[in-house]
């Protein structure tokens, strides 16, 4: 891991270098995705079947071979162990409870001239959620993407999940059952994103696509944005821990590992105010790494993008955190709620020594789909509001037509838009 000290004259340069991440799009990936999207848009189901058989090594004869029914999802739920059933239900219940509180409601008011103004909230009609498939599958992603849509009142939630070599993951399908997914198609990659965006003979066009995927999925989401909405194009996973030295070093070490084990370009950063404590955490990491099944990935991640930063105090640590704008921020300090008030930019803030980031990944309640790559400066977590729309309401009274008409007429003439002005003037006495 890199070692940085805020008192060093080259600290800012070192921090910028640490956060630099090459996000340039691969031209070859973009070309392949463009061809796939165009083909699916043109040939529909036939293209989808061909690409699925080619990339996932399946042997689908027709689109019916790629459809899972509610009965299939229920059967998957019944096949998994009881403790896993309970865990899925507990996580879904907590995520649902949290996202209920995010639900936007319609409102209106009448101003002094009798004009009614307001905002009408409606859910999206149909959404698609992309879920990675195969052995390394993530049922938590199903819950985090589907449940907010369910709470928002979306009538149709369509899930696509690849099944390489026909391998289905029962826990993922069980999560879909618990989270209220309407339909499931066993397709993945750019072809699945294109099918959701453009529609095929069998897969209906959705209004928005959410969920994580590989570089091809990300490129496809970028390409279809505008035809449909998307949640975000996520970068590598990130964690920043601010520690005051009161949390056991082993706990902090494992929290850093929890993000580093995602992949070699994930980022784990620790900011401390004591060199002795940073050394203690480093020693704990050296000891605990021996027990990690994904040791190679963790070591590569920490070597590539990990860091320990020595700050002069917690105020400075918080300012650094605001600059980094991390996906996950742990405030492993005393009085964490007070320090949280100093944080302006973070996807999720985990307060106190007992609030490990992994609890938020699975079952605390808030969404784990979070802005990465410093986009927390202007972006927010996935939520119920992402599956709702706002429409403005305006009902002008006869009296209001006089008052507003005068203003609109003057402004319209100022813009040389005569018809606009006349439309307002016709309603004036």
Curated annotation (Swiss-Prot):
Entry cofactors: Zn(2+)
One of its GO biological process terms is: L-histidine biosynthetic process
Q: What class of enzyme is it?
A: oxidoreductase
Gene Ontology terms, MF aspect? histidinol dehydrogenase activity; NAD binding; zinc ion binding
- Keyword Cytoplasm applies: no
Task: Give me the residues that bind Zn(2+), please.
Answer: 259, 262, 361, 420
Quote the catalytic residue positions. 327-328
GO CC entries: cytosol
Residues binding NAD(+) = 130, 191, 214
InterPro entries, alphabetically?
Ald_DH/histidinol_DH, Histidinol_DH_CS, Histidinol_DH_monofunct, Hstdl_DH
Cofactor note, please? Binds 1 zinc ion per subunit.
EC nos = 1.1.1.23
Its annotated pathway?
Answer: Amino-acid biosynthesis; L-histidine biosynthesis; L-histidine from 5-phospho-alpha-D-ribose 1-diphosphate: step 9/9
Can you tell me which residues bind substrate? Answer: 237, 259, 262, 328, 361, 415, 420
Q: What reaction is this protein's catalytic activity?
A: L-histidinol + 2 NAD(+) + H2O = L-histidine + 2 NADH + 3 H(+)
HAMAP family membership: HisD
Name the PANTHER family on file: HISTIDINE BIOSYNTHESIS TRIFUNCTIONAL PROTEIN (PTHR21256:SF2), HISTIDINOL DEHYDROGENASE HDH (PTHR21256)
Q: Which family does it belong to?
A: Belongs to the histidinol dehydrogenase family.
Function as written in the Swiss-Prot or TrEMBL entry: Catalyzes the sequential NAD-dependent oxidations of L-histidinol to L-histidinaldehyde and then to L-histidine.
Q: What is this protein called?
A: Histidinol dehydrogenase
Source organism per UniProt: Neisseria meningitidis serogroup A / serotype 4A (strain DSM 15465 / Z2491)
């Amino acid at each position: 891991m890199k070692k940085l000290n805020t008192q060093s004259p080259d600290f800012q340069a070192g921090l910028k270098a640490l956060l630099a991440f090459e996000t340039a799009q691969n031209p070859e990936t973009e070309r392949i995705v463009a061809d796939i999207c165009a083909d699916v848009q043109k040939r529909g189901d036939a293209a989808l079947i061909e690409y699925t058989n080619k990339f996932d090594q399946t042997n689908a004869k027709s689109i019916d071979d790629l459809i899972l029914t509610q009965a299939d999802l229920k059967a998957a739920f019944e096949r998994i162990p009881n403790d896993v059933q309970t865990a899925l239900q507990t996580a879904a219940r907590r995520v649902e409870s949290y996202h209920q509180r995010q639900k936007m409601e319609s409102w209106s008011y009448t101003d002094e001239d009798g004009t009614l103004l307001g905002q009408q909230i409606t859910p999206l009609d149909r959404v698609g959620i992309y879920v990675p498939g195969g052995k390394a599958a993530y049922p938590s992603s199903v819950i985090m993407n589907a449940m907010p849509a369910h709470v928002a009142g979306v009538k149709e939630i369509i899930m696509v999940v690849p099944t390489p070599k026909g391998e289905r993951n029962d826990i993922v399908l069980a999560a879909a059952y618990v989270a209220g997914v309407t339909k499931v198609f066993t397709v993945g990659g750019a072809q699945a994103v294109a099918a959701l965006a453009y529609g095929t003979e069998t897969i209906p066009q959705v209004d928005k696509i959410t969920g994580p995927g590989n570089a091809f999925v990300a490129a496809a989401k970028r390409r279809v944005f505008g035809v449909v909405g998307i949640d975000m194009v996520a970068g590598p996973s990130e964690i920043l821990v601010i520690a005051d030295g009161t949390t056991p070093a082993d706990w902090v070490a494992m929290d850093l590992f929890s993000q580093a084990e995602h992949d070699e370009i994930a980022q784990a950063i620790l900011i401390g105010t004591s060199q002795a404590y940073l050394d203690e955490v480093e020693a704990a990491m050296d000891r605990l790494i021996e027990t990690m099944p994904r040791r190679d990935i963790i070591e590569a991640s920490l070597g590539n993008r990990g860091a320990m930063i020595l700050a002069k105090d917690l105020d400075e640590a918080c300012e650094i955190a605001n600059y980094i704008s991390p996906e996950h921020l742990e405030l492993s300090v005393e009085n964490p709620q007070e320090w949280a008030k100093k944080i302006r930019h973070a996807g999720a803030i985990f307060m106190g020594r007992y609030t490990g980031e992994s609890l938020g990944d699975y079952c605390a309640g808030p969404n784990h789909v979070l802005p990465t790559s410093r986009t927390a400066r202007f972006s927010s977590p996935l939520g119920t509001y992402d599956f709702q729309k706002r429409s403005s309401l305006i009902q002008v009274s006869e009296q209001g037509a006089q008052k507003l008409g005068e203003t609109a007429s003057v402004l319209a003439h100022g813009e040389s838009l005569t018809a606009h002005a006349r439309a307002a003037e016709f309603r004036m006495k």
